[in-house]
């Protein structure tokens, strides 16, 4: 009850992000977040040495929780973004600033996230991408234990009760 209410991206909003992706390379980060379910800090702190492009996974080695230390699969849809960021420059981090430096959350949020949301007429926070991923996985029928593994959850039912926001159509079809 005290948790901040989070709203996942709708199918239409996800399509909007896909349409806008070619206008700025930093928009790809939104899609990387949606399709991996990682926290924004986990993606910004991801080092290239922990990314395996050929096998399509990466290791989260620094996380908010112990369960958060995990291997995350890279969806085929977003593999090209990982490849571009990986070979972009000499920065040890996968995602970097235009100057090739490590991205701080505030810098990304203020310089890119907020302007993108305004430009696309969408109102979301980075953590909503995590909720979106979990909802997409649940709607696709992925086993809850597998979802927990992917997103780094341990507790009973946390993923279902806190994160799953089924689209009304999916609920009507159930």
Residue ranges and their predicted role:
Residues 1-40, 44, 64-67, 88, ...:
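Basic, Lys/Arg- and aromatic-enriched nucleic-acid-binding interface segment
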């Amino acid at each position: 009850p005290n948790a901040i209410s989070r709203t996942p991206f709708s199918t239409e909003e996800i399509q909007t992000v896909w349409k806008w992706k070619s206008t700025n390379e930093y928009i790809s980060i939104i899609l990387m977040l949606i399709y991996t379910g990682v926290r924004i800090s986990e993606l910004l702190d991801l080092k290239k040495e922990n990314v395996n492009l050929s096998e399509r996974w990466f290791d989260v080695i620094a996380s908010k929780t112990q369960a958060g230390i995990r291997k995350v699969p890279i969806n085929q849809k977003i593999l090209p973004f990982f490849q571009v960021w990986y070979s972009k420059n000499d920065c040890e981090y996968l995602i970097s600033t235009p100057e090739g430096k490590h991205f701080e959350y505030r810098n990304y949020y203020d310089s890119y996230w907020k302007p993108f949301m305004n430009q696309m007429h969408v109102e979301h926070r980075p953590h909503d991408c995590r909720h979106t991923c979990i909802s997409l996985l649940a709607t696709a029928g992925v086993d809850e234990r597998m979802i927990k593994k992917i997103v780094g959850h341990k507790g009973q039912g946390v993923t279902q009760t806190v994160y799953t926001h089924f689209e009304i159509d999916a609920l009507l079809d159930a």
